């Protein structure tokens, strides 16, 4: 090996091991690693390296750096307090300042270690690659830096200390946010990463190297992967381990490398030196059926030689992409465009000198994100700096569009002055709109200064007030009182008030009036209407273990109280019910009305009787059975005595004729109709209808006279027909119920309340009551009725039930009252925002008051003396009042008259008279004095800068409390690439999900026309090559990424936002399909989508510092882009909507072309990895992945066969897998390999291994030199050795290798000696 005269740090160590591995194979590489380990341990032990607290040396410059940063931030805070910059600009400046300081300090830490203590153990540890890296060491000896809060917003208070100095309590709390987030993320990450790996393995498990060369002419164009100025992956790195698809020709025409040459590191560097782009073989362009060929895959990175046949490259690819998943952060903090390192490069003046602008440089004035004025470059040009003196040096900076200039043409600059920020990226940075709330720091009165508000109405009709022109919002200090609802101020503007004087008062008013009842000191009840049953007593009785209230009336009637005392009763509810058995029947039966009339409706509560009469009741006994007909013991029409068993275990209670109701052999009911039964009566001789009522004394037929009221019914019985005379019972119903009704006593506000007694029937005319025991037919009830005056709604009213003690008769009476309850405000000594309040009661218990009377008054008192301000005239309700106190004024003594006028607004730091600066901002009230003794009286105030377009939450003259939101600042910030990052982004790409805000792509090449309209929107048109003009509408918030007159290609992004891979595929396909036909267009579209996916996945991994070879991603992407969707089957057997492999369709279409039939038309599709797994040819593999039932059902219905081509299917079935050693047996079965008879297996003879004592003579082999200078044999050398042998004849093999036993002198002191060594 070569001698390297370097300090071997982490990066070099990696390279060294890689080199040894590639050149000398795994066994010797691991031996080298072991020896390096031994070496390290030996010297570490000798040196006694350890890390102690003393090794954490903090750079002495830290103090000055922090002081400088704090000074800069103080200046920024002062500018903010003076209203020169907005809250957003202040925040941005603070963040950037601390960030810069933290970075500088980190660099200083390294410089400090190198200069003062290069053998410092912390420094050695970090740079040797043992443990830790710079970002961790900087927390130990630099500063911990800025942290994000749980919402991902950066806290503008940095952690200035490091772990060596120790954190303050505040810093510790801030620091723990991020720490917790890290732990939680790690826990969530492992699961996501595992699932991603599983999906990847599933989609690519059947990709196996099955052939040597597919012979494709297609190739992949490879260039270095860049981002702005940074090279993410160099061309040499991307070429390494691939095979060329086209010859590489140098600038002078010489061929550097030919097609199908393998590119090793040296060749990669040579190629990268002469060209920027190379065409290589790639799995994406491989035409091998269902696999990848050796030449397209290239080297197996495991051993740095061409991949073997039968290698399961799919699984290797899946594992390679899935494994680093845990290292990717779930979501990096959404930092709000903070880290400016990537966006712009700052150029400072090297020494004192002057600057000049180059020719053609055109700029426009802008305000930077720190609120400074600068010039933004629109047309690129140069900035020239020239030092002082005759032989002064000059330096030229080329400025790209978008760069910021902080110096004017011809200005003199001092050393270290910031001259320009050069924008790095070629394209314009995409920006997004963000908002930030600004809250007031003090209470007071709002005053707009040079601020022009305008109202905007959106489509929903909501109005927002927006600052059309930026300006200042001032808050003039004062104490603001929040008035409670309904309070009215009793003071006027400019009135002087003292402590405790009344500022406002609220009145508590009754709506209905009535009798006052004081319940507690917080609540007043007013009885608006009441009713008392003064003739009746209420007693508590217990019956059947339950206590109930019973009302005894003067007529000795007993009513059961249905509502408990203390509860509310709604209008029309039943309060009590008469206890009465007169209307209760003994059995079931049928009811008929005779002269009784009822009111309409009211089925729920019963039917109210409006006119009295008689109820006729025809008894019958009904048993509901619902059992099998076989259990019936009696017959239909049979006469039974009381106590007869009619059905098993059911006995009848009365004698009579049986009627059986049955349906579908189920016995539903048995009805027993009591009465006198006359058999063998001839219907012809008797003039009586069935159902006719017979009066007492009426003759039925000779010998039979009716004694009571009866009903006749003809019956068919088993013994013959007969006449049944059924008894009829009569119940008398009165017109009016016997119970008393009672009206209300006091009726304030025209309300009346009444207890009305009503009679209600439970059944209507003709109802049958199915029962054995009997049922009540009529009930007398007391019902609550509330009447309102006029048209006021009373449906919502309810009454309270109360029991009143009667002193004289020692019993309780029932009273119903309608109450209005009023709650008094609590007295407050001092509410922080509302002032002290006192409540006075203006009524006594028992007072009778009219509606609208004032019951109580609450007074709000001043806490301090002052002048009243801020009451707006003509406003309906006044919610806030301002008091200007002595503390809100500021008096400044001046030696001479200041040049200010009353009413003028002054900001802090303003010079009043020479030598006197104002300490606080304020509004001039008055100027007093003469000669050299002047007094300036100010009202303290605070300005807030508002940028144009901000949303105003306040109006001029409003009163605000401290902490109220004043405005919502709307600002643009550079979109940071870290919004979706890490695993979620990888998943989004591999699952081919559509991004939330996709960019607009050009559908054809042409020249852009970009027009910026009045309302800040952008209009983009593209004049295509054939002259058509296409318009591309932009969504709100999208920014144009092209400039006017720019030439663009198909698929170029016109706006910012993420690319949608589906759209890329669609745009390319639809553009090329008419030109080149389906197949070529599909290839072009898929190729564009493939290139995008590979690069995007690489970008994510690179941003996390993970190196993955392109070929792994390509294998996965190949699986995602293999299929097309059939649009029209033509004359083929394929169905529309079917997903088929592109190669397969093309073969069928070629055949169709030969026979002249119609080919199939199709659209290429991009499938996410889950979809692709479920759409494989193998249903066993798909079913074992997800949706097992669905996949298997469909496979069964379609009669699919599984050819067991992948690994998974074979594992599930339990066969040898078709990879590795199982590859050849499978391929012969499938007929993919022609068996070669000329190659027989060779027995590998032992290699001559010269011992260390003898001089190793190089063994000569005609083809390839195999050096066997030690006894370490590994896979690489065995492969090389086998390779040399297969090309020799047997004799040569035997001649060249002298297999003499003496040479194997193993027990000598070889490298693997005994322990004593």
Swiss-Prot record:
- InterPro entries given in the database record: DNA-dir_RpoC2_beta_pp, DNA-dir_RpoC_beta_prime, RNA_pol_Rpb1_3, RNA_pol_Rpb1_3_sf, RNA_pol_Rpb1_4, RNA_pol_Rpb1_5, Rpb1_funnel_sf
**Lineage of the organism:** Bacteria, Bacillati, Cyanobacteriota, Cyanophyceae, Synechococcales
Per its UniProt record, the required cofactor names are: Zn(2+)
Record's cofactor remark: Binds 1 Zn(2+) ion per subunit.
Work out whether the entry's keyword set contains Transcription.
yes
Q: What is this protein called?
A: DNA-directed RNA polymerase subunit beta'
Q: What is its EC number?
A: 2.7.7.6
**What biological function has been recorded for the protein in this entry?**
DNA-dependent RNA polymerase catalyzes the transcription of DNA into RNA using the four ribonucleoside triphosphates as substrates.
Q: Where does Zn(2+) bind?
A: 214, 286, 293, 296
Q: Which organism is it from?
A: Synechocystis sp. (strain ATCC 27184 / PCC 6803 / Kazusa)
User: Cellular component GO terms, alphabetically?
Assistant: DNA-directed RNA polymerase complex
State the reactions this protein catalyses: RNA(n) + a ribonucleoside 5'-triphosphate = RNA(n+1) + diphosphate
Instruction: Give the Acidic residues compositional bias ranges.
Output: 1288-1317
Q: Which UniProt keywords apply?
A: DNA-directed RNA polymerase, Metal-binding, Nucleotidyltransferase, Transcription, Transferase, Zinc
Give a GO biological-process term. DNA-templated transcription
Query: Which NCBIfam families does this chain map to?
Result: PRK02597.1, rpoC2_cyan
Regarding protein family, the annotation reads: Belongs to the RNA polymerase beta' chain family. RpoC2 subfamily.
Q: Is Transcription tagged as a keyword?
A: yes
One GO MF term on file is: DNA-directed RNA polymerase activity
